[in-house]
Amino acid sequence: MLVSYKWLKELVDIDVTPAALAEKMSTTGIEVEGIEVPADGLSKLVVGHVLSCEDVPETHLHLCQVDTGDETPRQIVCGAPNVKAGIKVIVAVPGARIADNYKIKKGKIRGMESLGMICSLQELGLSDSIIPKEFSDGIQILPEEAVPGDAIFKYLDLDDHIIELSITPNRADALSMRGVAHEVAAIYGKSVSFPQKNLQESDKATSEAIEVAIASDNVLTYASRVVENVKVKPSPQWLQNLLMNAGIRPINNVVDVTNYVLLYFGQPMHAFDYDKFEDHKIVARAARQGESLVTLDGEKRDLTTEDLVITVADKPVALAGVMGGQATEIDANSQTVVLEAAVFDGKSIRKTSGRLNLRSESSSRFEKGVNYATVLEALDFAAAMLQELAEGQVLSGHVQAGQLPTEPVEVSTSLDYVNVRLGTELTFADIQRIFDQLGFGLTGDETSFTVAVPRRRWDVSIPADLVEEIARIYGYDKLPTTLPEAGGTAAELTPTQALRRKVRGLAEGLGLTEIISYALTTPEKAVEFAVAPSHLTELMWPMSVERSALRQNMVSGMLDTVAYNVARKQSNLALYEIGKIFEQEANPKEDLPNEVNHFAFAICGLVAQKDFQTQAQAVDFYHAKGNLDTLFANLNLKVQYVPTKDLANMHPGRTALILLDEQVIGFVGQVHPGTAKAYSIPETYVAELDMAALEAALPSDQTFAEITKFPAMTRDVALLLDREVSHQAIVTAIESAGVKRLTSIKLFDVYEGATIQAGKKSMAYSLTFQNPNDNLTDEEVAKYMEKITKALTEQVGAEVR
């Protein structure tokens, strides 16, 4: 919100500098982003009167004689297409400074002496987006009353201080000059002074010319007035200056009046050309699927049933709360104007403006809320301004559909409630003074009082809001420093936080380095490594396609990080991340996705460097699986690894799904060579786990076992097996023998070679047995080995060598 300091002083009688005002507002709840004076950096810019203007043959130039208040006219060569004799212009005399600190000097153009420069507004540093279109390609023409030789700043209000406010969603009442004036008046204990317009109505009633109706619950109220015999022309300079300083381009007097009322009241308005209506009944309704509308910017908008439209003869003529339609826009030939003032549901407007990427001053105010109490007042004010600036005749009365509550909202509390929460010792007289400054009504006493909150402050509705208002006006800096009276509560990690912290510690203990990757990625990468892809959740208006969809896996983001580092000659990497993936089982356009915590890691390169006594050792599947085994052992979880070829981006012979209680919770393996090539990375091993599943499976209680004093006994067994039999199948068979004293199963050798028949392999295991309460005997261990051998023979066809 850009606030004109000059305009503000017309509404509130304050005698403070803009800088002091900005500091005071920032400390009372409305942050000031900065203060800008458009004239800063500009100098020696004066009013010039073009006495004569001659075309220079065979050029686009003009040789002008300009009166700048000196004894003799000043000769200036100008190339602007709209320069002509008789107009008042902006002249930068030699030595002047214009935008970008450019200094004007005497010069010669095509051999003709030029003693200055006739300036456009762009050359004064104003943005193209706010300059009237009639002057966008030429010089600015000043009002007739401008005096040659005068500094131009006062004629264009370039000497005004523009205060930029950062308005939070709860203070949308400050999105208007009246709202800001009320705030400033409360801060300084002043009264507001709002100008009144003398509205003179004709004998003809508005209801004779137009009627309105509402056909949607998202239209809270809709009101109109009609102004006849208007003369569409440029607005007076003061109004153009005011709009440009607020960041709005002047269009014509009719449109400018609606924008003025928007800034003044915070009430969005629209003006229709009545003569372009096919019917005299306006209906505000929901759009129908398949309908479309060409808006004022010339774009065709395809509508949905979630959009609100203003219709005439059942045809959309405006996108309610967002932008008007081109078919009924005001132009130079318009004579009868229909003014619209309405209140639309903020959520509906937000959806429409977001879907169409069409945000406007009007839509932002409807989204945040408008003052119910001034809808009709703003409508009457706009009609009176058209009467004044466009010589229009205002039809009597207005037509309205839908009524809104305008009476103050009553909120009750007590003095004790206030003081306990602020740590103060305020008296009831203090409270009365503060609410009087705010313009709120107050009845009752210190035991219990009721505050009548005006509709302009729709953010105040509960006792806590009243406490905030008291604190703001009393002064946050005056609040005493106090300690909480309630006893403290010992902090405790949630199960999710505890698991996250433990996994992070284990990962870093394994030598992994934490990274944080983007949750937004491409639609392809979002599902690239997902075990069970769901509906894709995409942004409607992404900054780039690389950040357009919410990820459903974390590995793709980790591989981007691997690629980034490999490209910079860092090829030995061990990375991990704990973050969220986003699963969407419903409609992504209507429902939010489920956020699920995942853990993932990626390793590549060497785990051991070559030296005088050690060979270089590259990472492999077993390093990745070993990391997971350590993790699961420390979490006291038992998982299964099941080989899989179903993950297209993983190596079909070096990938396994991870099962916990028969449910897939993740995967581990080598990235498919084709995928690795696409990422420009070397052989890389990755794993990803669902941490929510881990948390659900964690044992609730930990049982500590006494360390036994009795020795363990170990037996080695070599097995001849079919080549297809996996290590997991062998472990499962050994465990199925049900030997309770078996405490460890370790694979220490795998052999395939000439001494083994084709299609076979040898696998050697070391089995450890221990009785925590007694010594084991050789006979007992022999029985255990017999049971295990039998299970291996029956289940995997193993032959003990």
UniProtKB/Swiss-Prot annotation:
It comes from Streptococcus pyogenes serotype M1. CDD domains: PheRS_beta_core, tRNA_bind_bactPheRS. The keyword Transport does not apply. This is Phenylalanine--tRNA ligase beta subunit. It catalyses: tRNA(Phe) + L-phenylalanine + ATP = L-phenylalanyl-tRNA(Phe) + AMP + diphosphate + H(+). PANTHER family: PHENYLALANINE--TRNA LIGASE BETA SUBUNIT (PTHR10947:SF0), PHENYLALANYL-TRNA SYNTHETASE BETA CHAIN AND LEUCINE-RICH REPEAT-CONTAINING PROTEIN 47 (PTHR10947). The gene is pheT. One of its GO terms (biological process) is phenylalanyl-tRNA aminoacylation. Residues 39-153 form the tRNA-binding domain. Tetramer of two alpha and two beta subunits. GO terms for molecular function: ATP binding; catalytic activity, acting on a protein; magnesium ion binding; phenylalanine-tRNA ligase activity; transferase activity; tRNA binding.
